[in-house]
Amino acid sequence: MRITNFIKRLVVLVALVMTSGAVYAENNSVIERAVREIVAKYDKESGVKCMTVTKGQGLEIVKLMLREQMGKAFLKGVTSVTIIEYGSASAEVCEALRKEVDVFTSLLKEFNVSEAKATPNGGYSRGFANVIDADAGRVSDFVIAVDSDEMKSIIYMTGDMVVKEQ
């Protein structure tokens, strides 16, 4: 379960950076619009599956699936989840999606899991968060991009999430 450990480490890193006093606020509509643009651009591509869920549309089921990796406290405040899964996409589409993730560097605070931005098995991983209250550990937007042998996806969560060290 390398991905599970990766996500846990990412949540802990977000907590550590936030406790250092790095407050970073941004307009949510700009972030949501960037995610919607990526979904619209790649949803019809072969090998790419996009899904957005909100309350009443299966959000609780998605939270249950992510609970082990993200933690119950973190997911409690999530109001929407967008998942872009591209495990069956062509190499060109995978590379294009990696480049699309760069848009978040100007919108959110980036948290690297490793200095080389690579997972132990040679994959690619990046995490981003919009910190709204560093002292309380509150995040309004959270993006995680994973491209490894096990999983290729971009997950975007919005809401009022609380990051606690595990």
What residues fall within each predicted segment?
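Early exported N-terminus immediately downstream of N-terminal targeting peptides
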Residues: 28-100
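Sec/Tat signal peptide C-region and signal peptidase I cleavage site
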Residues: 21-27
